[in-house]
Amino acid sequence: RQFKQTIKEADGILLIMPEYNWSVPGVLKNAIDWLSRGEKVMIGKPVMTAGVSPGMMGTIRAQLHIRQILSSPGVQGRLLPPAGNEIIINLAEQKFKDGRLVDEATLQFVDGVIQRFIQFVQKG
């Protein structure tokens, strides 16, 4: 109940995920399924997705799948438009040091997307 209440009260949701077998982690899918039952707290909620992976493709397949899930009946999150707003960090081992993102170009890109998401949330 607390999780559902937290999502209900949030101005927006940022989902950061890995990619497992070309899809979203099962625990994330389960959480979204749970949020879509009873009081549907995701409907109309601004959502942005991001992912990090050591592979060349980043989390592109999981990102595509999560967008489908978030658009489904009972969920219907208000997704930040994808054009230029998808944070898909590939080759993570080259871009992180001691758990911190250190690649300057990626940092600048992420900062820009976060700023656009804040504006997206504020516009309602």
Regions found by a protein language model. Give the residues of each.
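Glycine-rich phosphate/pyrophosphate-binding loop and the adjoining helix
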Residues: 77-124
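Helix-loop-strand module that forms the ligand-binding subsite of alpha/beta enzymes
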Residues: 2-76
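A short, well-ordered alpha-helical element
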Residues: 1-5, 106-109
